[in-house]
């Protein structure tokens, strides 16, 4: 399982505007460059169309994605969905939320489901400690999401004032960054993710990791990337509303730590803890859809339709025996 790796350590609170500009420049891109959208195919699911597409990434290469479109002319709300990074899961890709997006479409939602960098062909994960590729992948995930906003808002059937982001685990952190970077979003659902490096760094696990890799090396790396702390962004999400969903049965994201993350997030916000594993559960899905329905002014989705969405499951832990 990959949750956001803590990047900031011993951060200082500097005066506002200059610090904001310095942080935000890391996520700049050319909004006027061509999206170069390529349609690969389309599948009909009842009255919903699922387009298999790709678009140009500002970081180079292509962003594979699904665009889920309801029937009718709109204007529709829009949601970007960010999948988890759970090792061993068949849904470590844009398919995680596909059935949920199709179920929500008739309520009046166009959805964009992205394959984030780890899920793309040719991506080679770098498992070494404190490597630069993890920084590159994180920034690319954020910028590719912002480019996804450009794609959605270029559609004539999308209402620019009703845009939300749903992110799970690693991409909950992506949403945390976006909440303080891109003001085009009205609402965020952040599911079972690390939302503050300063909170994470108080954990025994991270202090043990610091000792293992070497305090001097660790501290130098963290100082270099002090701007990449989710908490410094999600603490400035206002006026967007942030709904945090956490699971009670997790080893690292304990209920106490979850509440500490929630305390960092700006108002307005909601927090709920579920009796679930990292995959969360059907109750969380019902709450998520209810939140999006309220925030984006959607039609109601029948309970039986929500209940028909299959449960996401945690893959089995790797065996330590042969």
How would you describe each model-predicted region?
Residues 65, 75-85:
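Short beta-strand element of the alpha/beta-hydrolase
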Residues 146-205:
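Primarily recognizes the serine-hydrolase "nucleophile elbow" in alpha/beta-hydrolase
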Residues 237-238, 243-246:
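Short beta-strand/loop motif that positions the catalytic acidic residue
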């Amino acid at each position: 399982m990959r949750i956001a790796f803590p990047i900031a350590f011993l951060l200082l609170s500097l005066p506002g505007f200059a610090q904001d500009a310095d942080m935000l420049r890391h996520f700049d891109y050319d909004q006027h460059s061509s999206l170069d959208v390529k349609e690969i195919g389309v599948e009909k699911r009842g009255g919903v169309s699922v387009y298999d597409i790709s678009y140009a990434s500002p970081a180079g290469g292509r962003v594979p994605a699904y665009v889920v479109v309801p029937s009718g002319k709109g204007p529709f709300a829009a949601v970007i969905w960010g999948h988890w990074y759970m090792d061993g899961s068949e849904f470590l890709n844009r398919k995680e939320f596909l059935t949920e997006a199709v179920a929500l479409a008739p309520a009046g939602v166009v959805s964009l489901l992205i394959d984030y960098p780890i899920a793309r062909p040719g991506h080679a994960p770098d498992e070494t400690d404190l490597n630069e590729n993890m920084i590159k992948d994180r920034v690319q995930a954020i910028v590719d999401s912002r480019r996804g906003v450009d794609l959605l808002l270029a559609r004539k059937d999308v209402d620019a004032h009703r845009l939300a982001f749903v992110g799970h685990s690693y991409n909950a952190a992506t949403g945390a960054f976006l909440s303080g970077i891109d003001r085009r979003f009205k609402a965020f659902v952040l599911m079972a993710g690390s939302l503050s490096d300063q909170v994470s760094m108080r954990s025994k696990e991270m202090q043990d990791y610091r000792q293992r890799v070497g305090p001097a090396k660790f501290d130098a790396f963290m100082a270099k990337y002090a701007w990449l702390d989710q908490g410094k962004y999600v603490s400035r999400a206002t006026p967007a509303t942030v709904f945090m969903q956490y699971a009670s049965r997790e080893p690292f994201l304990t209920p106490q730590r979850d509440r500490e993350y929630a305390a960092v997030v700006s108002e307005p916000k909601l927090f709920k803890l579920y009796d679930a594993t990292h995959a969360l559960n059907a109750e969380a899905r019902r709450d998520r859809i209810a939140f999006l329905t309220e925030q984006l002014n959607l039609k109601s989705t029948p309970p039986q339709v929500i209940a028909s969405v299959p449960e996401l499951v945690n893959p089995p832990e790797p065996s330590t025996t042969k």
